From Swiss-Prot:
Span list, region Disordered: 1-81, 391-411
Source species of the chain: Saccharomyces cerevisiae (strain ATCC 204508 / S288c) (Baker's yeast)
GO cellular component: endoplasmic reticulum-vacuole membrane contact site; fungal-type vacuole membrane; peroxisomal membrane; vacuole-mitochondrion membrane contact site
Protein name stated in the entry: Uncharacterized protein YMR160W
UniProt keywords, alphabetically: Phosphoprotein
Organism ancestry: Eukaryota, Fungi, Dikarya, Ascomycota, Saccharomycotina
Phosphoserine modification, residue list: S76, S79
Additional notes on this entry: Present with 279 molecules/cell in log phase SD medium.
Biological processes per GO annotation: sphingolipid metabolic process
Composition-biased stretches (Polar residues): 64-81
Biased composition (Low complexity): 28-44, 391-400
């Protein structure tokens, strides 16, 4: 028995030693990251007391914590998200790699309660999730006053507060010294814009104040349920509308795989950048304060609803910011626009809890929206010749018209599948499944589309001050104008603008000798004679004569669209596909054009090498670090660079040689006029007299192919019919037809070139409509576009060349 007892004692002692060793090993070895992440739960039940003690970074009304109504706001979050039960009663834990005791992060956790090790762990955890792009996260920042930072777009060192879904910072937001995401350039940020906005960068140029007679008529029409107020009217007061106002900017951007982004949008900016850019333009209006919430969301591998819930969870921490706010501005890009509208509806629905009233302005800026989905277009020679030859051989035995029609449908479906496969090349299956749902917005009866329709309809009908501004590119390789501007969504409070890039209108800023400034002084008509002392310059650049037709045509179409003349929607749908080309994206250039561009660029670089290296004009980081942040940086210019031509060449040469040091911004997201236009569309327009619901058009006009003969005949008849409707329009704004782009060069800072104008003249006759048709005929005679689609459109519209003068054209369309 003694022997047996001794063996049992030894076994017990051995087991005790092993358990002790395991505990010691667990204390010494830090936990693995994946296991750590799995311990976090999706929390939806934040309380009103959940606020970090962040010192000077966080702003609270009257210097106090959140107000009591916020508790109701949290309760509404819980009920809306259907997350009740045991999860609301369990705290969230994270095991520190520095401590054996766990970090408890729950609704009652204060930032001031955390020690250095815990803070470091939570910060590293948040940054790790951000780098993986697997969860939604929000960056809060109080924008400094314009007098303290004139060039705020160049500063990423402004402190803010980070909150990442699925981490401890989702419960206890963390103050950081600088923005944790991608962005920021240690060198120079040079903004070069040669662009034009249609119909105008200011609604004052195509809208007017509602006359008393019109107001009475609209009231009577509304009483009898007749159509009325087809468009917005201007306010009487148009000055200091944002001065001393409290403003919140909410930017929402969805991540995209790099290759997908390049093939579709060419590029997009971060939510942080969009918030900064809009706040920079707001600074000119002298608001009392500007607060920003920048949401970066994993919409590339996560569906809309889960992402929406994550954003709502993060919004709970900032409920106190909305108290007595005067304006809330939203910004969304492409597939984040639906999420932006859902968040806007959620915030507005809770306005009483958030303590802002119905007078608060709510407005959404949409870049390249996906609300109308997309389909693929390709007008390249190799695609059309090979595919249609194969189609002809396969259907040659089928003489029946219905069989031919089926073959065309089969070809269209197959071609769409081929292009979609190219778009999704290089991304995983989950991302493909998620991103492929974007095209479902094309069907107005799809679940994706209905969800957005309901949110947008609620905002348009229930919130008088709500505005929606769609911005899209005229020249694109992916989506048509109708798709980007959601042309089938009709409501007076929806405004649409087109952004035209001079790069795709035959204007080459590298070869500045061919530029033609639009000045009244003949002495400065040559760009070599325009001298600059600083890297800030603004002028107008003449549009080449052989491309004026495109601008003239779309200018009047955008005017009619924003004035509520929906009878022109069919022709917009028919014309839009012709402005699609692979050449309108640097990442989708056809091989022959890419090779041609590379050869010409190589020659240009050799010329610039000999020009600038010989003279010793080189930039370095030491020089940049020696300058004050946000300065105009005159040292960017070598001493003997004194003209616009030399500056353009020098900056673009430096950008080619060291793009990480000299970075050029020239896309739609970088144009200050876009943001000013959005603000003017919002604050200068008057609320309609009566509420209206969103109306949807059923698109039966967009062709399946621009090369289809039936569609070509249809376009000829539709354009003729549109001309006959155009010359009947009365009270069109009498203003100059655009013939010049805005050329702007700046180093981070905003060039405020706003000039006070008397606005256009409105007369109740057809004089302006006739003048517009005359200009369409005149500019067509010189039209010589470069791309296959536009050349094809020119051939289809060759009927315009049959008329000897515009009077004959006018007389002809009058007879129809």
């Amino acid at each position: 028995m003694d022997v047996v007892q001794q063996k049992q004692d030894k076994q017990l002692q051995h087991q005790t030693q092993e358990q002790q060793q395991i505990r010691e090993d667990q204390q010494e070895v830090p936990p693995q990251r994946p296991r750590q992440q799995n311990r976090w739960k999706p929390w939806w039940n934040s309380t009103a007391d959940d606020e970090p003690n962040t010192g000077r970074i966080a702003e609270y009304p009257n210097g106090q914590g959140r107000s009591s109504p916020t508790t109701d706001f949290q309760d509404s979050v819980n009920s809306n998200n259907d997350n009740k039960g045991i999860w609301s009663k369990i705290a969230s834990f994270a095991t520190s790699r520095y401590r054996s005791a766990p970090i408890v992060v729950d609704d009652n956790t204060r930032y001031s309660q955390l020690n250095t090790e815990q803070i470091n762990f939570l910060e590293n955890e948040a940054k790790d999730i951000i780098s993986k792009k697997s969860k939604s996260w929000c960056w809060y920042e109080a924008i400094p006053h314009i007098s303290n930072s004139s060039n705020i777009i160049d500063s990423i060192d402004t402190p803010g507060i980070i909150s990442v879904s699925g981490t401890g910072s989702a419960k206890c937001p963390l103050p950081l010294n600088k923005y944790p995401g991608e962005g920021g350039n240690p060198g120079y940020n040079v903004f070069i814009n040669d662009s034009l906005i249609l119909p105008s960068d200011n609604p004052l140029n195509f809208l007017h104040v509602q006359p008393l007679r019109t107001k009475v008529l609209n009231t009577i029409k509304n009483y009898y349920n007749f159509p009325n107020e087809q468009h917005l009217y201007l306010r009487q007061k148009k000055t200091a509308l944002l001065k001393d106002k409290r403003i919140i900017i909410i930017s929402v951007v969805g991540d995209l795989p790099e290759k997908y982004e390049q093939r579709s949008l060419e590029s997009q900016r971060s939510a942080y950048y969009l918030s900064r850019k809009l706040s920079q333009n707001l600074a000119q209006e002298q608001p009392q304060r500007v607060l920003t919430l920048s949401f970066q969301c994993p919409l590339h591998n996560q569906d809309l609803i889960p992402t929406y819930k994550e954003c709502v969870e993060l919004l709970n921490h900032w409920a106190h910011l909305f108290k007595e706010v005067d304006s809330i501005f939203f910004v969304g890009v492409y597939h984040s626009v639906p999420l932006t509208l859902l968040l806007a509806k959620y915030i507005v629905q809770n306005n009483e809890v958030l303590e802002f009233d119905e007078n608060t302005t709510v407005s959404v800026l949409s870049f390249q929206s996906c609300l109308q989905g997309y389909r693929f277009w390709d007008h390249s020679t190799d695609f059309t010749s090979n595919s249609y030859n194969n189609l002809g051989s396969n259907s040659s035995t089928n003489e029946n018209d219905s069989n031919d029609h089926d073959s065309n449908n089969d070809f269209t479906t197959k071609s769409q599948q081929i292009k979609e496969k190219q778009l999704f090349q290089g991304i995983d299956k989950k991302q493909q499944d998620t991103l492929s749902k974007i095209k479902n917005y094309r069907r107005i009866d799809s679940s994706e589309s209905k969800l957005v329709q309901d949110a947008l309809d609620w905002l348009l009908f229930n919130w008088d001050t709500f505005r929606l501004t769609f911005f899209g590119k005229l020249y694109d390789n992916f989506m048509t104008i109708s798709e980007k501007l959601a042309i089938d969504y009709n409501h007076p409070k929806i405004l649409r603008n087109l952004w035209c890039n001079g790069k795709y209108m035959g204007i080459d800023l590298k070869n500045a000798n061919n530029l033609n400034l639009d000045t009244d002084d003949e002495a400065t008509s040559n760009i070599n004679d325009v001298h600059v002392r600083t890297p800030n310059f603004e002028s107008r650049l003449k549009i080449p004569t052989n491309r004026l037709f495109e601008i003239t045509l779309w200018d009047i179409l955008m005017i009619t669209e924003n004035l509520g003349y929906k009878q022109f929607i069919p022709i917009i749908n028919l014309l839009s596909p012709f402005f699609i080309s692979r050449s309108f994206n640097d990442y989708t250039l056809p091989p022959n054009i890419r090779k041609q561009y590379q050869n010409s660029n190589k020659i240009w670089l050799q010329e610039m090498d000999s020009k600038w290296k010989m003279n010793g004009h080189q930039l370095n980081y030491d020089q940049r670090e020696g300058e004050s942040l946000g300065s105009s940086s005159e040292s960017l210019l070598p001493e003997n660079i004194s003209t616009v031509k030399d500056f353009l060449q020098f900056v673009q040469y430096q950008n080619e040689k060291s793009s990480d040091f000299v970075r050029i911004y020239s896309d739609i997201y970088d144009d200050d006029k876009v943001y000013k236009c959005f603000l003017y569309n919002t604050i200068f327009t008057k609320n309609p007299l009566s509420r209206k619901h969103l109306r949807l058009n059923i698109d039966l006009d967009t062709p399946t192919s621009i090369l289809n003969t039936v569609n070509q005949y249809d376009l000829v008849w539709k354009i003729h019919d549109s001309f006959s409707k155009l010359i009947q329009l009365k009270n069109l704004p009498q203003r100059e037809i655009p013939h010049a782009l805005r050329l702007s060069i700046s180093l981070n800072c905003f060039l405020d070139s706003t000039t006070s104008t008397s606005g256009p003249v409105f007369q109740r006759d057809t004089v302006e409509a006739l003048r517009r048709l005359t200009e369409i005929w005149r500019t067509y005679q010189d039209w010589s576009p470069p791309t296959r689609g536009l050349k094809h459109l020119r051939d289809i519209l060759s009927v315009l060349a049959m008329y000897d003068n515009p009077k004959n054209l006018i007389n002809d369309v009058r007879r129809t």
